[in-house]
């Protein structure tokens, strides 16, 4: 819109020189190289942010741009994100205890602490059960993670937290990955993992069972961190009306987690890319 007052009067009122006004108009019409580059980067950032289902913060978006061969500093990425209001998911502390270790079943020794870091897939798996709230009630999710690549190699969901749930997750992982005998399978001391039926499944596959020490959550920290990502980036962003809704959202997220989500511990590669790179 053109001003209704003489330019000279406006410049004097706002204490701006005529040359400064014209210089600003030129900059707006012809943005310099830095502004042009910011515009290009913003378009790429918004594309990558949408591809992550609006979960990535500046560290992962920074690595995503580098993967596109776009040199840019992390500070610049953070600045541009603030400019347009892009915000990744932030941690939320919530916890419900799912482990029932008050049982008479045998407890396996903690062999994980004695093992060196795995050097290839299917040497060490860790397992745990988590929960998801829906309007219909709890949905329980049993998962198994490969300690080498952080890939979730097996999972199962049910409205019941019982031995068949962890057996289903085990069968999913076993049939998909075909581990050799000697696989170390680590979990907490929950009755589901200590049950005779589940111990039989492991023995039949030649897997060696390991369990955390009593009351020590750090023994299974790798699995806990995976659940934290699921809760923050998927579960807490929804209000599930049904268990079926929750199942669908979780299934989609777990495939994203394995195939596309960048992990800082893997050099910001996804678990699938990390395994493909090292095989």
PLM region spans:
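Charged DNA-binding/catalytic regions of mobile-element recombinases
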Residues: 1-279
């Amino acid at each position: 819109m053109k001003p209704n007052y003489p330019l000279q009067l406006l410049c004097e009122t706002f204490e701006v020189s005529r040359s400064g006004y014209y210089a600003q108009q030129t900059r707006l019409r012809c943005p310099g190289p830095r502004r042009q580059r910011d515009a290009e980067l913003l378009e790429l950032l918004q594309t990558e942010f949408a591809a992550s289902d609006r979960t990535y913060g500046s560290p992962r978006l920074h690595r995503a741009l580098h993967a596109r061969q776009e040199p840019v500093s992390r500070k610049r990425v953070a600045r541009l994100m603030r400019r347009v209001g892009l915000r990744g998911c932030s941690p939320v502390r919530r916890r419900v205890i799912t482990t029932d270790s008050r049982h008479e079943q045998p407890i396996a020794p903690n062999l994980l602490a004695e093992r060196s870091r795995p050097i290839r897939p299917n040497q060490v798996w860790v397992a745990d059960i988590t929960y998801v709230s829906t309007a219909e009630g709890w949905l329980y999710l049993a998962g198994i993670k490969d300690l080498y690549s952080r890939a979730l190699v097996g999972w199962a969901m049910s409205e019941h937290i019982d031995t068949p749930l962890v057996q289903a997750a085990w069968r999913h992982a076993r049939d998909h990955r075909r581990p050799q005998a000697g696989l170390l399978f680590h979990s907490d001391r929950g009755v589901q993992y200590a049950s005779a039926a589940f111990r039989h499944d492991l023995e039949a596959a030649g897997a060696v069972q390991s369990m955390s020490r009593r009351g020590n959550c750090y023994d299974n920290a790798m699995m806990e961190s995976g659940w934290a990502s699921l809760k923050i980036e998927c579960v807490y962003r929804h209000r599930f009306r049904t268990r079926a809704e929750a199942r669908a959202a979780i299934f989609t997220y777990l495939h994203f987690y394995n195939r596309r989500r960048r992990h800082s511990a893997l050099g910001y590669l996804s678990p699938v890319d990390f395994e493909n790179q090292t095989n």
